[in-house]
Amino acid sequence: MNNSKLKQYVQLVQTANQNFNLTGLKTEGEIYEHLVQEIIELFNEYDSYFDHKKVADLGSGNGCPGVILKLLFPQIKTLDLIDSKHKKVNFLKEVIQTLELNNTQALCARIENHTEQYDTLCSRGLGSIIEVNAFALKLLKPNGIIFHIKQSLDQYLEFEDSEQKDQFKPLFFKFFHGKRQQILIAMKKNV
């Protein structure tokens, strides 16, 4: 993993955050801890879900987790950073260019209108598990994987009581206990 590129990413987020709202985090230390370190800790052992895969970060915003995943797993075949806000997409394009992220693009699109199909999807802070899974049904290839990053299991319990439980099989949970709890929830599309 390229630590100098991670540092550059943190600096890019902090600088852009002074001009428009990318995150509530202000210092480089906070940005590193909550955007970079958490993602590395949550995903570091799951390279097989990204190796030579077509990946999308839904509601990418400041590029977390997509940019960090591309730096952690440079062997990702293609990465689409998708957001509906032009300012954020322009920021993501700057990040892609500055960090020289190959086979990565930032797309200004509404997820419900996007038609590409992916092996792996990631979502952090976009919506509830049920809402994002509704998009994932269309965007994931058969047997594709979606990773949700949440702060509690409440939304997972709602998923368990929904009609979607037949469409997605939970694979695993991974907990990260830093200053705030983060939970990685991996699900496989059954359809």
Swiss-Prot record:
Q: Where does S-adenosyl-L-methionine bind?
A: 59, 111-112, 124
Give the top-level enzyme category: transferase
What EC number is given for this enzyme?
A: 2.1.1.-
Give compartment(s).
Cytoplasm
Paired cysteines (S-S): none
Name residues in a coiled coil. none
| Statement: the UniProt record of this protein carries the keyword ATP-binding | no
The signal peptide stretch is none
User: InterPro entries of this UniProt entry?
Assistant: rRNA_ssu_MeTfrase_G, SAM-dependent_MTases_sf
Pfam families, per database record: GidB
Instruction: Kindly state which keywords UniProt assigns to this record, in alphabetical order.
Output: Cytoplasm, Methyltransferase, rRNA processing, S-adenosyl-L-methionine, Transferase
Q: Does the keyword Metal-binding apply?
A: no
- Show the GO cellular component annotation of the record: cytosol
Q: Could you state a single Gene Ontology molecular function term?
A: rRNA (guanine-N7-)-methyltransferase activity
Role noted for this protein: Specifically methylates the N7 position of a guanine in 16S rRNA.
Matching NCBIfam families, A to Z?
rsmG_gidB
Protein family (similarity comment): Belongs to the methyltransferase superfamily. RNA methyltransferase RsmG family.
HAMAP family according to UniProt: 16SrRNA_methyltr_G
Which protein, by its recorded name, is this?
Ribosomal RNA small subunit methyltransferase G
Q: What is the lineage of its organism?
A: Bacteria, Bacillati, Mycoplasmatota, Mycoplasmoidales, Mycoplasmoidaceae
Q: Which gene produces this protein?
A: rsmG
